[in-house]
A protein has these predicted regions:
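Nudix hydrolase/Nudix homology domain
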Residues: 1-4, 31, 67, 105, ...
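N-terminal short leaders/motifs
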Residues: 1-9, 99
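Acidic, metal-coordinating catalytic segment for phosphate/diphosphate chemistry
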Residues: 8-45, 50
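Active-site segment of metal-dependent pyrophosphate-handling enzymes
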Residues: 19, 41, 53, 61-63, ...
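Short, well-ordered beta-strand micro-motif
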Residues: 22-24, 48, 124-126, 146-148, ...
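Short clusters of small/polar residues that mark proteolytic maturation junctions
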Residues: 36-37, 59, 110, 166
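Conserved Nudix-box catalytic region and its N-terminal flanking loop in Nudix hydrolases
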Residues: 38, 44-90, 138
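Catalytic glutamate of the conserved HExxH
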Residues: 90-95, 148
């Protein structure tokens, strides 16, 4: 069985954070179709862990119309060349003010592979020291707090934490820390 082949591609929309493109495709059986894809820069997600607690941020997520707890994460479209570890350091410092002595890569995530090309790296940050956050204007409502492992697991199981990347990152942490 072959793969879907891109025959042509056109940009439908672009802004600083994303590109929406529509591709003409040929399926393995030869039939033609279209596929819409959201292209976004690579992101980094950081699991801040002080040995007993996890650092989470809470912010209003406009698309779902609610505040959400999640691990610090983000992209830097103007720094697309940035290595994932550097991006992780930047996001941690920017969103929480935290600095880490060590960043361990736990794995890679595909955000929504049925509609987006975006991929991200998950890093475990340890050796944490406090500092001042440097949040972007869009993050002005963000707050951060520390939670025990039991609290994080309860927040996930009760639906308080619903961010798929955060839940997947916690799963990677659990697999690495058996």
């Amino acid at each position: 069985v072959g793969f879907i082949e891109r025959v042509a591609s056109r940009e439908i929309y672009r802004n600083r954070w994303m590109v929406l493109r529509e591709d003409d495709i040929r399926r393995p059986d030869g039939s033609l179709g279209i596929y819409s894809v959201v292209d976004k820069p690579t992101f980094a997600l950081v699991v801040p862990y002080d040995g007993q607690r996890f650092g989470l941020v809470e912010q209003f997520r406009y698309p779902v119309g609610a505040r959400r707890w999640e691990f610090p994460q983000g992209t830097a479209p103007e720094f697309a060349h940035m290595e994932p570890r550097e991006l992780a350091e930047r996001e941690l410092r920017e969103e929480t003010g935290l600095h880490a002595a060590s960043f361990e890569a736990l794995g890679q995530l595909d955000v929504a592979p049925g509609m987006s090309s975006q991929r991200g790296w998950v890093f475990l940050a340890t050796g944490i020291t406090e500092g001042e956050s440097d949040r972007e204007h869009e993050e002005q409502d963000m707050r951060s707090a520390w939670f025990s492992r039991a609290d994080v697991e309860q927040m996930i199981s009760s639906g308080v934490i619903t961010d798929a990347q955060t839940i997947a990152a916690y799963g990677l942490f659990a697999l690495h820390r058996r």
